[in-house]
């Protein structure tokens, strides 16, 4: 079943009270909220214990075999330790934590209030209401990394100071004690906009003593969907709204001496397509809130352990051409254009047991010019090919997405080759109404 289908099914089972097991190496942000709360793991697919957990559950529930899994925590997750920001990690230090229910019964909320002139204050009782405005450049988001990292590094978010120049930033004093959060932080904002279509991007970062800022979690909202996606409606410019965002679930430890940072921006390109025109948000400080799901460390967490991961034998393969993975930000100061180039080239791999060569390459470009929000442009080139002896086949797909104030413009081309002869080709050109996007 496709990933999103599995998550929708898991969410329905949770709502009906049906027992099920969810096991995953990663959580795709923003999808399958009920199921997302139930599973998490620290590494890529190569380090996950999914098969062993599923086997133990099936043995216990379907076959009546005593596997011990029913005495284990209902939920286990990897509580990440603080690390300096970088676009790739060899490992993420931390520890396993477990809960007997979700949401956990002993979870406590810790509330922070954004205050003038940029302070994030814990448990504020009475503070002055002030209006602070933000209108972000399209560069806000260039260093955000991939929507869902697939370990094709360097695709993780970089030092968030690169992003904070285009954001409204609130930073807490240094923590006097370590803080652990587990779950989905929420943000409630009193805001108004000067345009009928606008978006807000919110990031929570771990600010280290040397001022490096590592993104912990984030959330995006098209403000025309402020009351849900079933019936979006334009904003009334100048009218204040109470808007709530749920950030992506996370398990994170903030050491003493570190600071929390809440960053608010009005664009997050290219993770989110920008609105039709630049919009300014007016945020009311003193009444807006950041609520963190605070979890106290427990000695029982030390007893959570897994056997070494098991898997099928690795197939024999030979790397015929060198793979190349990179992300590059290119600034053309003369033309005032910025481009994010993503290179995901796996090269050519040979599988001797099958006498088969496999070639995979994906290139992506995301660009814009100045503050022209309708200059945003996303382009992809994907190639896939197989070769055995004198026989070879490959496909090439090119996709280009641009926009006007009223429509998205999609241009796509598919070519299929057998040897050097093109055996199939198709082209698409479509205009799609933006519909408050």
Predicted feature locations:
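Short alpha-helix in the alpha/beta-hydrolase fold that links the catalytic acid
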Residues: 13-27
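Active-site-proximal cap/lid insertion segments
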Residues: 37-42, 50, 54
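Catalytic histidine neighborhood in serine/cysteine hydrolases
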Residues: 26-41
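Short beta-strand/loop motif that positions the catalytic acidic residue
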Residues: 2-5
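C-terminal, loop-rich substrate-recognition/catalytic regions characterized by aromatic stacking residues
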Residues: 48-437
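Alpha-helix capping and helix-loop boundary segments enriched in small/acidic/polar residues
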Residues: 8, 12, 42-48
């Amino acid at each position: 079943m496709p990933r999103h289908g599995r998550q929708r099914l898991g969410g329905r089972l949770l709502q009906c009270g049906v027992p099920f097991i969810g096991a995953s190496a990663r959580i795709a942000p923003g999808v399958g909220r009920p199921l997302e709360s139930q599973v998490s793991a620290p590494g890529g697919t190569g380090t996950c214990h999914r098969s062993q957990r599923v086997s133990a559950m099936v043995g216990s529930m379907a076959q009546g075999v005593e596997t011990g899994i029913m005495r284990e925590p209902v939920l286990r997750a990897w509580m990440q330790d603080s690390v300096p920001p970088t676009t790739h990690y060899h490992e993420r230090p931390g520890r396993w934590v477990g809960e007997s229910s979700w949401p956990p019964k002993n979870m406590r909320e810790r509330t922070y209030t954004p205050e003038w002139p940029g302070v994030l204050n814990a448990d504020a009782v009475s503070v002055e209401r002030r209006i602070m405005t933000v209108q972000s450049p399209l560069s806000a988001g260039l260093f955000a990394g991939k929507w869902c990292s697939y370990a094709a590094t360097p695709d993780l978010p970089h030092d968030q100071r690169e992003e904070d120049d285009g954001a409204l930033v609130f930073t807490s004093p240094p923590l006097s004690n370590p803080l652990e959060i587990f779950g989905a932080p929420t943000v409630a904002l009193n805001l108004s906009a000067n345009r009928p279509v606008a978006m807000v991007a919110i990031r929570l970062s771990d600010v280290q003593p040397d001022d490096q800022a590592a993104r912990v979690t984030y959330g995006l909202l098209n403000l025309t969907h402020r009351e849900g996606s079933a019936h979006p409606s334009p904003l009334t410019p100048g009218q204040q709204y109470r808007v709530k965002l749920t950030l992506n679930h996370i398990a994170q430890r903030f050491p003493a001496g570190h600071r929390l940072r809440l960053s608010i921006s009005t664009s997050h390109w290219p993770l989110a397509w920008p609105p039709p025109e630049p919009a300014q948000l007016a945020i009311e400080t003193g009444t807006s809130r950041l609520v963190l799901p605070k979890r106290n460390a427990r000695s029982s967490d030390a007893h959570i352990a897994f056997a070494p991961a098991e898997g099928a034998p690795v197939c024999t393969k030979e790397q015929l051409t060198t793979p190349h993975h990179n992300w590059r930000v290119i600034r053309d100061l003369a033309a005032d254009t910025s481009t994010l180039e993503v290179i995901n080239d796996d090269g050519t791999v040979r599988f001797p047991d099958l006498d088969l060569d496999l070639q995979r390459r994906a290139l992506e470009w995301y660009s814009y010019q100045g503050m022209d929000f309708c200059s945003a442009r996303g382009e992809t080139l994907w190639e896939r090919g197989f070769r055995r002896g004198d026989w070879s086949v490959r496909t090439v797909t090119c996709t280009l997405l641009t926009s006007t104030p009223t429509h998205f413009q999609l241009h796509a081309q598919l070519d299929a080759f057998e040897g050097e002869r093109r055996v199939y080709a198709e082209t698409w050109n479509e205009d799609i109404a933006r519909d408050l996007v």
